[in-house]
Amino acid sequence: MSEALTELASYLGEARGNLIAASQLKYGELTLTATGENLIALLTFLRDDAKCGFVNMIDICGVDWPQRELRFDVVYHLLSPKKNLRIRVKVATDEDTPVPSACAVYPGADWFERETWDMYGVLFTGHPDLRRILTDYGFEGHPLRKDFPTTGFVEVRYDDAAKRVVYEPVELKQEFRNFDFMSPWEGTEYVLPGDEKAKQ
């Protein structure tokens, strides 16, 4: 598999090296890094080229790196059924710089981009309907950002007396505690097949 990916990386470097900022083959997976300006051209080439054939977009996800200037990575996971290969295409962006929508190249990118915007706040230009898909309509913030509080801002619950859903500020019943999960109990010493070899 990695031999085929090595050949693919070499071919992509020769055929469309101007669209690829970096290429990395690690842990048996090929990752291409592109800029926002070259993203759509690269995705179109990967889909249409006979030696590539990445006709399926499996997923789009976000990664938050708060310490970086370009805080977010938008990662496109592609599949070539004919070649039985998977690759990733990465684009770095910040909170204010939108990424071009891949919906024209891969119509299935629609909901994936909505999810990435909903969870991380990454904007996509040219998206036909960029609105929340997983969180509630009035939700504030983007919950998969590393600076989003784990408790959230608002508690949503159904009020049986009012017969409706109510939104209230989060009220913690106790302070945060630091739990020590190390057990004071000593476990049984199990003798597993092959242990005698480890002692030699």
From Swiss-Prot:
Assigned protein family: Belongs to the complex I 30 kDa subunit family.
Q: Name one GO molecular function term.
A: NADH dehydrogenase (ubiquinone) activity
Tell me, what does this protein do in biology? NDH-1 shuttles electrons from NADH, via FMN and iron-sulfur (Fe-S) centers, to quinones in the respiratory chain. The immediate electron acceptor for the enzyme in this species is believed to be ubiquinone. Couples the redox reaction to proton translocation (for every two electrons transferred, four hydrogen ions are translocated across the cytoplasmic membrane), and thus conserves the redox energy in a proton gradient.
Q: Extract the HAMAP family matched here.
A: NDH1_NuoC
- Recorded superkingdom: Bacteria
Catalyses which reaction(s)? a quinone + NADH + 5 H(+)(in) = a quinol + NAD(+) + 4 H(+)(out)
Q: Which top EC class is named for this enzyme in its record? A: translocase
**Annotated localization:** Cell inner membrane
The UniProt entry's GO CC annotations, sorted and at most eight, read: plasma membrane
Quaternary structure and partners: NDH-1 is composed of 14 different subunits. Subunits NuoB, C, D, E, F, and G constitute the peripheral sector of the complex.
Q: What is this protein called?
A: NADH-quinone oxidoreductase subunit C
Primary location class: membrane
Tell me which UniProt keywords the record has, alphabetically: Cell inner membrane, Cell membrane, Membrane, NAD, Quinone, Translocase, Transport, Ubiquinone
This chain is encoded by the gene named: nuoC
Stated EC number for the protein is 7.1.1.-
The record describes its membrane topology as:
Peripheral membrane protein
Output the InterPro entries linked to this UniProt entry.
Answer: NADH_DH_suC, NADH_quin_OxRdtase_su_C/D-like, NADH_UbQ_OxRdtase_30kDa_su, NADH_UbQ_OxRdtase_CS
**NCBIfam families xrefs:** NuoC_fam, PRK06074.1-5
